[in-house]
From Swiss-Prot:
Residues 426-474, 511-541 form a coiled coil. The keyword Transmembrane applies. This is Envelope glycoprotein gp70. The lineage of its organism: Viruses, Riboviria, Pararnavirae, Artverviricota, Revtraviricetes. The record marks 138 as: Involved in binding to the cell receptor. The gene is env. It comes from Mouse mammary tumor virus (strain BR6).
């Protein structure tokens, strides 16, 4: 009987059979993977890409309609140029979302309404100082704009005076009033050269009316400022008479504090006081008639009460504003805000009517009055002026109004609102993704220090060409984004630069060397404001990239409601509820500027820069390249030795398997039962 072969041929051949059985499964998996790749490549093609809508004529018509609506709202005449500018405003870039900071914008190209509560004096120059007093108008520069639409806000009731019979809400009505004063006749035979007779001067002047429901005589006990003394104490009879019968009376800067006339604005709270009436409650006509012979048979006006007759001269009607107190009984302790020269502006709205002593006819005197920089006059029809109080703020709007700096009798049918160019505003601007810095040199050092770190430089080399391309691409994208996001701050900077240069050139042309004292005073006042702006600029740390505005280090909270900023730009300065308290913002900016000065360590920055430059020395890089070379050599050696070690390990495992087979045969046969020649060699598995 032939002997069976040693071992188990079925079991030993299972290793090969199992491998053959697994191949169909691997092929199926590979096939499925190929199908999935094809499907994945088809999915992007199946995505529907929206077709970009082409610009059609209907779109252009819609844009033109929006631009025409902008011109209509702003009351701007429609021309090809204005329509093009309106289209640019409609097609303006979207708002940017970079870093926002508060910017200090000196002398901005905007106008704010002036309230009666403003303590800044409004200076008025006239061409008839002989009959109106004050300072002469040597300018002769009278400017009038076209129709504009004005919108503003004020903390207090705006200064609004109506020269028409119709009065807008919040405005005061004016009327003709009679001012009388008498001067002595000349008699050289008498002591002092004064005769026994008196000469009466009669002047009809437009001022606040003293009749009607909005006028009340209220005794007042409050003391006026020392600048306004009692007329009967400060100016005696004939104190300014110089012996010239043709010289009109002088205007006296005094008051009668024991009597006062109050005027109320139409439909609004607050009072305007006038202490220039010597006898507000008694008509002085009867007293003058009783002394008719003394005044050369002078007869007072008929059907017109006389309350402003004073022997020493004409008393200037200084107006004092009083806010309505919360407690009606606390009126005597409410502060009064004086307005000393506004009466001259009102007087110029109509001709002066003068009756000289000894004349029967009245003389019409045309008059003009101008406000000085930075004030202007907004003229408009009463029905087109709207003053509305919302909460604690007055909203002012005027349609088809004109801006001017002077008034004359042509304004008799209009109402006037005083506006002012503010010395500065705080405007939030966007500077993009770049950091805020006030010194370009220091910022350059910082940039260089960040870029020359040795470890980052070596890491960039190891990354390879693809990584370098990605880094360059990211820098290019960041630069493009930075340029786009800086549009807001750049626009404000360029706008203010253009306005500043234009106004400076115009001012140089207008202000001639032969300007009189008043023009020189205006220049000095404006230079004083420029010095104040420069002082603020020098004490505040500003962004180095913007020269015509000061981008402060105070961040702007972009989540704030823009209406608060808009209210500030329209005229609200000190109201935390609806706007910002500008004084508090200014203090915060000053504190941050001081902290920023202390935070800059120039010595530390220089040392850091020196260390960074030292790290870029090629001799110092040798150690890094040595380490890299040693590491690469070790890696090559390991890769070369690994196949040899793996082959030796496979042979060892093969020998161990052979020894195990021999031991199994010995156990089955009970020793060395089979000769070596008859032993069947078992199939071996190759590990190589």
């Amino acid at each position: 009987m032939p002997k069976h072969q040693s071992g188990s041929p079925t079991d030993s051949s299972d290793l090969l059979l199992s491998g053959k059985k697994q191949r169909p499964h691997l092929a199926l998996r590979r096939k499925r993977r190929r199908e999935m790749r094809k499907i994945n490549r088809k999915v992007p093609r199946m995505n529907l890409v929206p077709i970009k809508e082409k610009t059609a004529w209907q779109h252009l018509q819609a844009l033109i309609s929006e631009a025409e609506e902008v011109l209509k709202t702003s009351q701007t005449p429609q021309t090809s140029l204005t329509l093009f500018l309106a289209l640019l405003s409609v097609l303006g870039p979207p708002p940017v979302t970079g870093e926002s900071y508060w910017a200090y914008l000196p002398k901005p190209p905007i106008l704010h309404p002036v309230g009666w509560g403003s303590t800044d004096p409004i200076r008025v120059l006239t061409n008839q100082t002989m009959y109106l007093g004050g300072s002469p108008d040597f300018h002769g520069f009278r400017n009038m704009s076209g129709n504009v639409h004005f919108e503003g806000k004020s903390d207090t009731l705006p200064i609004c005076l109506s020269f028409s019979f119709s009065t807008p809400t919040g405005c005061f009505q004016v009327d003709k009033q009679v001012f009388l004063s008498d001067t002595p006749t000349v008699d050289n035979n008498k002591p002092g050269g004064k005769g026994d007779k008196r000469r009466m001067w009669e002047l009809w002047l437009t001022t606040l009316g003293n009749s009607g429901a909005n006028t009340k005589l209220v005794p007042i006990k409050k003391k006026l400022p020392p600048k306004y003394p009692h007329c009967q104490i400060a100016f005696k009879k004939d104190a300014f008479w110089e012996g010239d019968e043709s010289a009109p009376p002088r205007w006296l800067p005094c008051a009668f504090p024991d009597q006062g006339v109050s005027f109320s604005p139409k439909g609004a709270l607050g009072l305007l006081w006038d202490f220039s009436l010597p006898s507000p409650s008694v008509d002085q006509s009867d007293q003058i008639k009783s002394k008719k012979n003394l005044f050369g048979n002078y007869t007072p006006p008929v059907n017109k009460e006389v309350h402003r007759w004073y022997e020493a001269g004409w008393v200037e009607p200084t107006w004092f504003w009083e806010n309505s107190p919360k407690d009606p009984n606390d009126r005597d302790f409410t502060a009064l805000v004086p307005h000393t020269e506004l009466f001259r502006l009102v007087a110029a709205s109509r001709h002066l009517i003068l009756k000289r002593p000894g004349f029967q006819e009245h003389e019409m005197i045309p008059t003009s009055a101008c406000v000085t920089y930075p004030y202007a006059i907004l003229l408009g029809l009463p029905q087109l002026i709207d003053i509305e109080k919302r909460g604690s703020t007055f909203h002012i709007s005027c349609s088809s109004c004109r801006l001017t700096n002077c008034l004359d009798s042509s304004a008799y049918d209009y109402a006037a609102i005083i506006v002012k160019r503010p010395p500065y505003v705080l405007l939030p601007v966007d500077i993009g993704d770049e950091p805020w810095f006030d010194d370009s040199a220091i910022q350059t050092f910082r940039y260089a220090t960040d870029l020359i770190r040795a470890k980052r430089f070596v890491a960039a080399i190891i990354l390879g060409i693809s990584a370098l391309i990605a880094i360059i691409t990211s820098f290019a994208v960041a630069t493009t984004a930075l340029v786009k996001e800086m549009q807001t701050a750049t626009f404000v900077n360029n706008l203010h630069r253009n306005v500043t240069l234009a106004l400076s050139e115009q001012r140089i042309i207008d202000l001639k060397l032969e300007a009189r004292l008043n023009a020189l005073e205006e220049v000095v006042l404006e230079l004083g404001q420029d010095v104040a702006n420069l002082k603020t600029r020098m004490s505040t740390r500003c962004h180095a990239n913007y020269d015509f505005i000061c981008v402060t280090p105070l961040p702007y909270n972009a989540t704030e409601n823009w209406e608060r900023t808009r209210a500030h730009l329209l005229g609200i300065w000190n109201d935390n509820e609806i706007s910002y308290n500008i004084q508090e913002l200014t203090n915060l900016i000053s504190d941050m500027s001081k902290q920023h000065i202390d935070a800059v360590d120039l010595s530390g920055l220089a040392q850091s820069f020196a260390n960074g430059v030292k790290a870029l020395n090629p001799l110092d890089w040798t150690q890094y390249f040595i380490f890299i070379g040693v590491g690469a050599l070790l890696l090559v050696i390991v890769l070369m030795i690994f196949p040899i070690v793996f082959q030796c390990l496979a042979k060892s495992l093969d020998q161990v398997q052979s020894d195990l087979n021999v031991l199994l045969l010995k156990k089955k046969k009970g020793g060395n039962a089979a000769p070596a020649a008859e032993m069947v060699e078992l199939p071996r598995v190759s590990y190589t």
